[in-house]
Amino acid sequence: MGNSTESVITDYLVRIITREGNIRALACVTTNLVGDACRRHGTLPTASAALGRALTGGVLMGALLKTGQRIALTFEGNGPLKKIIVEADANGAVRGLVRNPAVSLLRDDGKLDVAGALGKAGFLTVSRDLGLKEPYTGTVMLYTSEIAEDLAWYLTESEQIPSAVGLGVYVEQDGSVAAAGGFLIQALPPGDDQLIDRIMERIASMPPVTEMLRAGATPEGLLEYLFDGIPFDILEKRATALVCSCSRERIERVLLSLGSDELSSLIHDQGEASVGCEFCGEHYNFTREELERLRDSLTAV
């Protein structure tokens, strides 16, 4: 991905493996990148929580890839959010969008209703670009529509890797993102049922991720809680950031793809053009002279 919209580099991810080598886990703090994305998309609180969870999930899933590989997550439900799309790479870069950012839906207990906003019926599609001719794509039905459980269900069901995922985004009364982050835990063969049960008990007794992050927990702190008394080694610490791959050159290629006649009509009817990126909100403006130069480059070929 490019570097057009990097967040302040204070968000980061930690990857570990148990000393026995049978459990791997990742945890990350994504408060700044989620806040940046939500500001760019003008999301209302429930849309902020949903997009933030999906972005954090993308960071975690991306960290399982090899350098040069990318992953795309598409959550599509029958709720008012309609669709969330997230793209991430192996280097901690992520970008995303929510099709309808103007959603603020509450549950009966007053908490943000992410599942209701996404919709109980729908699909999660995961596409991995592994550098082959075609990306590997898998689709599962939404499990709870809470994002974290849907990712865990996909990993367990579609990729046959027993997984647990926890994601959290805390949105303040003023709509700002106060905390965001999460964890992903996977059992590696041969499985140790006793150890897995022990970790599942820790997950069950764990305070909400957002509560721990607001209290100052780091990715290391989340992992230390989850793996209490279980020796592990830290394999990697990596910065994560909101990074978009859009650029003026890419937009120029899109305009060139319209063809000479379409560009001539655009010049005649509007005289200029402003093209926005749906992922980061960046706008690229083209004057009449610039559009004419693009059109003339086509006719000169």
From Swiss-Prot:
Residue ranges the record marks as coiled coil: none
Cysteines engaged in disulfide bonds, as pairs: 244-246, 277-280
UniProt GO MF annotations: protein folding chaperone; unfolded protein binding
Pfam families membership: HSP33
NCBIfam families the UniProt entry points to: PRK00114.1
GO BP annotations, alphabetical order: protein refolding
Post-translational modification: Under oxidizing conditions two disulfide bonds are formed involving the reactive cysteines. Under reducing conditions zinc is bound to the reactive cysteines and the protein is inactive.
Swiss-Prot/TrEMBL keywords: Chaperone, Cytoplasm, Disulfide bond, Redox-active center, Zinc
UniProt record similarity statement: Belongs to the HSP33 family.
Organism encoding this protein: Geobacter sulfurreducens (strain ATCC 51573 / DSM 12127 / PCA)
Annotated localization: Cytoplasm
Protein name: 33 kDa chaperonin
UniProt entry tagged with the keyword Cytoplasm: yes
The keyword Cytoplasm belongs to this UniProt entry's keyword annotation: yes
Record's function text: Redox regulated molecular chaperone. Protects both thermally unfolding and oxidatively damaged proteins from irreversible aggregation. Plays an important role in the bacterial defense system toward oxidative stress.
Membrane-traversing stretches: none
Gene that specifies this protein: hslO
Gene3D superfamilies: Hsp33 domain, HSP33 redox switch-like
HAMAP family assigned to the protein according to its UniProt record, in alphabetical order: HslO
Gene Ontology cellular-component terms listed: cytoplasm
